[in-house]
């Protein structure tokens, strides 16, 4: 995805965990952080406490949605996804992308990957990999400042 592109529709899921959200619900009032992760991704698990901290710190100002992107057959087990999500305190809605519908819509190749959309649903920041949480927070704060 390129910057300023609109958020894709959140469709094609195998399932939703922790509730379901639509693109329409995410656009209008608050910016949105969509993060891709996988149960086989060590870096994702390492970064999750920081993502959760974000979610809790900005809960009134920011929508947070997780996308589980399988990287192997083992990653397709719904029980394991649910179990890993619980172990890592992923309480935000999780789009289970077993068929890579959202992965393809986002043109995403990485986990972890982070997409920050402003309140109008335009992509404002993208980053992938395990580092750079400070950069992510900076970008989120910038988009939040525009909302006030």
Swiss-Prot record:
SUPFAM superfamilies: Thioredoxin-like (SSF52833). Keywords: Cytoplasm, Disulfide bond, Electron transport, Oxidoreductase, Redox-active center, Transport. It is an enzyme of class 1 (oxidoreductase). Disulfide bonds join 41-44. One of its GO terms (cellular component) is cytoplasm. It comes from the Bacteria. Monomer. Participates in various redox reactions through the reversible oxidation of its active center dithiol to a disulfide and catalyzes dithiol-disulfide exchange reactions. This is Thiol-disulfide oxidoreductase YkuV. It comes from Bacillus subtilis (strain 168). The lineage of its organism: Bacteria, Bacillati, Bacillota, Bacilli, Bacillales.
